[in-house]
Amino acid sequence: MNIIKELETNVDWNRVFGVVDSLYSDKGFSSNADNFARATMVEKALDKFSDIKRVDQNGYDFEWEDDKIELKMGKNLFYKVKDPKATKKFKVKSFLSETKTVEDFRQISTFDWLLVIALTARRVVVVEDEHARSLYQEGADGAMIALQDGDYYECNIGEINPILPPINLSYLYQQADQHFLNF
């Protein structure tokens, strides 16, 4: 079985997108500082509701069989009117404190597949690593990518009927904070 078939048949996208809907409508998450917590929980949801394992390694986020998968996700990734099969530019690699260039990132393979989840449009697309690296562009603080029709395979994930968690994550975080600081 390949990764595309795995994504199309063995991921409970109703629950994954239920987690997404819950996190992005949670009024307790109101600042950019909350983005890391939300992204991490979406990764954990994909791990829990599939056989794709979250490993959170440098250069890739998941493993499935012998494949390494880098996940990128965002709201409003695909154009709505201009070209619905094209994405806006999004960051795929960060320079951080490294002295790397976009050309360096084009040469270094750290994953086999780039998995892109469009959170609002509920679309899941996959790009083969070598092709993804050929599309890297210079960004302010890292390598950016913009996908066009033909650059990716769009997974057929069917109609999504989100199943939301019964409680908001921000509430659980508040409870954990209170317990942690209660000494």
Locate predicted features.
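Nucleic-acid endonuclease domains
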Residues: M1-F183
